[in-house]
């Protein structure tokens, strides 16, 4: 018998639970996909394509919906002899400047022997190369910029939609699809970029439990053998997903981790108890990974949120969080950040799912502001903040979670 043998009792097709799996039909996003399809319709009509901006939290179907509709758009466009459609999808994670985006796009249209370096060219030269490549391609070109909020300067977001109007292109018709996880990204765009990029805006809200059940059931039917899932497993995974900001990706990860635990334990079925065990494993890992990637100031902001949560003072506005954060920074021996930079850390924590942000509008008198709440287990967060708690000290609000006489390492081992 070999060291590795195939397991066939639990999974029929484990890959059906992965993020990149493309089902034949997308469920739970009918309203958004209908609006999205209508926004793409001008391509089939032979018209100038719309510029489309999608926004919503991670795991709510923006990228999956885009891939699904683009696949159908390319398939249907091929039926018409007068439509020449090209689609380029680019993930902007790790690309912080318009220059980097432009060079990547140039290389997307060139073969491997004609690639250009990502440094060393004047910006105007790179843009000229890009216009040449786009016009050489011709026809209708859709450029999909996923995680577009990573771009720190918005020059490319103005130049691309306006390229034809500015006489930089004569043959190609360009459309931009921008996908953002950051709700505030649109607000930070310059007015001229907003008017060009945001012709059609579609918000993808969080999934509710009913929609998550549809998604999980669709994937589970492909992923698992009949009879493996006990009653209530799908519903419990969906309930956790709805609680975790309506993130389908996290719900699928939870179902996969549960299946993996069942396989590791050599059980024949998947139970609700295994779901709870898998959730604990995933949440600890997610918190550790998210917090380890933060700066020292990010750690202090998280710690401030935990203490406010334990005092029953959340949801909290920035003005309520700042004094606690400032106090912790001083105790840690570092200068506190200005309010705007502290808000940036709150936004990052919200994107990571460690906290949630709700926008409030009280009209002219109260204005618009955001309230923040803790979304993950405070005990697990403290376990990941060992050095920060050591530097600042154990706040009185969390003494019930951390024994003041014990080290945090002792706490983690209990």
Curated annotation (Swiss-Prot):
Residues given in the record as ATP binding sites: 60-64, 207, 219
Name the UniProt record assigns to this protein: ORC1-type DNA replication protein 11
Family matches, as InterPro entries: AAA_22, Cdc6_C, Cdc6_lid, ORC1/CDC6, Orc1/Cdc6_arc, P-loop_NTPase, WH-like_DNA-bd_sf, WH_DNA-bd_sf
Family: Belongs to the CDC6/cdc18 family.
Keywords: ATP-binding, DNA replication, Nucleotide-binding, Plasmid
SUPFAM superfamilies (alphabetical): P-loop containing nucleoside triphosphate hydrolases, Winged helix' DNA-binding domain
Biological role stated in the UniProt entry: Involved in regulation of DNA replication.
GO terms (BP aspect): DNA replication
One GO MF term: ATP binding
């Amino acid at each position: 018998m070999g060291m590795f043998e195939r397991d066939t009792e639990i999974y029929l097709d484990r890959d059906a639970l992965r993020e990149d799996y493309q089902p034949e039909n997308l469920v739970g996003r009918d309203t958004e996909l209908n609006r999205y399809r209508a926004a793409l319709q001008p391509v089939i009509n032979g018209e100038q394509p719309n510029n489309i901006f999608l926004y919503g939290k991670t795991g709510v179907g923006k990228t999956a919906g885009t891939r699904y509709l683009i696949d159908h758009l390319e398939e249907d466009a091929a039926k018409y002899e007068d439509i020449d459609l090209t689609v380029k999808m680019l993930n902007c994670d790790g690309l912080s400047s318009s220059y980097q985006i432009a060079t990547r796009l140039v290389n997307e249209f060139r073969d491997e022997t004609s690639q250009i370096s990502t440094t060393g060219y004047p910006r105007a030269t790179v843009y000229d190369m890009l216009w040449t490549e786009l016009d050489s391609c011709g026809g209708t070109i859709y450029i999909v910029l996923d995680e577009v909020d990573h771009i720190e300067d918005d020059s490319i977001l103005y130049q691309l939609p306006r390229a034809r109007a500015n006489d930089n292109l004569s043959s190609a018709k360009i459309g931009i699809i921008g996908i953002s996880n950051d709700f505030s990204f649109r607000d930070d765009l310059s007015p001229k970029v907003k008017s060009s990029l945001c012709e059609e805006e579609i918000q993808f809200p969080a999934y509710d439990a009913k929609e998550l059940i549809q998604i999980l059931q669709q994937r589970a039917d492909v992923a698992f053998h009949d009879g493996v899932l006990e009653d209530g497993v799908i519903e419990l995974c969906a309930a956790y997903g709805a609680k975790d900001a309506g993130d389908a990706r996290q719900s699928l990860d939870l179902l996969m981790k549960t299946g993996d635990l069942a396989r590791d334990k050599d059980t024949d079925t998947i139970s609700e108890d295994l779901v709870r065990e898998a959730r604990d494993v995933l949440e600890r890992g997610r918190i550790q990974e998210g917090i380890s990637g933060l700066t020292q100031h990010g750690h202090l902001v998280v710690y401030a949120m935990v203490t406010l949560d334990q005092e029953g003072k959340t949801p909290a506005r920035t003005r309520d969080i700042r004094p606690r954060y400032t106090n912790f920074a001083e105790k840690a021996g570092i200068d506190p950040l200005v309010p705007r930079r502290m808000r940036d850390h709150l936004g990052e924590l919200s994107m990571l799912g460690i906290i949630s942000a709700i926008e409030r509008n009280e009209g002219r008198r109260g204005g618009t502001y955001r309230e923040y709440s803790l979304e993950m287990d405070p005990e697990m967060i403290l376990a990941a903040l060992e050095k920060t708690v050591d530097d600042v000290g154990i706040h009185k609000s969390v003494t019930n979670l951390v024994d003041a006489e014990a080290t945090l390492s002792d706490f983690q081992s209990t």
